[in-house]
């Protein structure tokens, strides 16, 4: 069996797989916890992750929400400046009406 060198692409792929599995595990835990209630044993590690105000990258969730909605984007179709929080809604209506 020949061994291939480790590349950035393979490391990135491994990182993505691990991140997806971690998020899936946390999601399963949350759904089980909400279904079973608080009667089960508590996992300190996962409870810390759930109660944290930071996302998986260590960034504050509230700051991300505010910074994303305060950004303005230019609509390619009609040329208007649209707030980030309303961009998807605008694009749906804008493309339906075919504004120019």
From Swiss-Prot:
Gene Ontology cellular component terms for the protein in this record: DUBm complex; SAGA complex
Keyword Transmembrane helix: no
Annotated compartments: Nucleus
Main location: nucleus
InterPro entries in alphabetical order: SAGA_su_Sgf11 (IPR013246)
Residues in SGF11-type zinc fingers: 73-94
Keywords from the named record: Activator, Chromatin regulator, Metal-binding, Nucleus, Transcription, Transcription regulation, Zinc, Zinc-finger
Keyword Transcription regulation: yes
GO molecular function list: transcription coactivator activity; zinc ion binding
GO terms, biological process: chromatin organization
UniProt remark on domains: The long N-terminal helix forms part of the 'assembly lobe' of the SAGA deubiquitination module.
Complex formation: Component of the 1.8 MDa SAGA transcription coactivator-HAT complex. SAGA is built of 5 distinct domains with specialized functions. Within the SAGA complex, SUS1, SGF11, SGF73 and UBP8 form an additional subcomplex of SAGA called the DUB module (deubiquitination module). Interacts directly with SGF73, SUS1 and UBP8.
Family designation: Belongs to the SGF11 family.
Function, as annotated: Functions as a component of the transcription regulatory histone acetylation (HAT) complex SAGA. At the promoters, SAGA is required for recruitment of the basal transcription machinery. It influences RNA polymerase II transcriptional activity through different activities such as TBP interaction and promoter selectivity, interaction with transcription activators, and chromatin modification through histone acetylation and deubiquitination. SAGA acetylates nucleosomal histone H3 to some extent (to form H3K9ac, H3K14ac, H3K18ac and H3K23ac).
HAMAP family membership: Sgf11
Protein name: SAGA-associated factor 11
Gene: SGF11
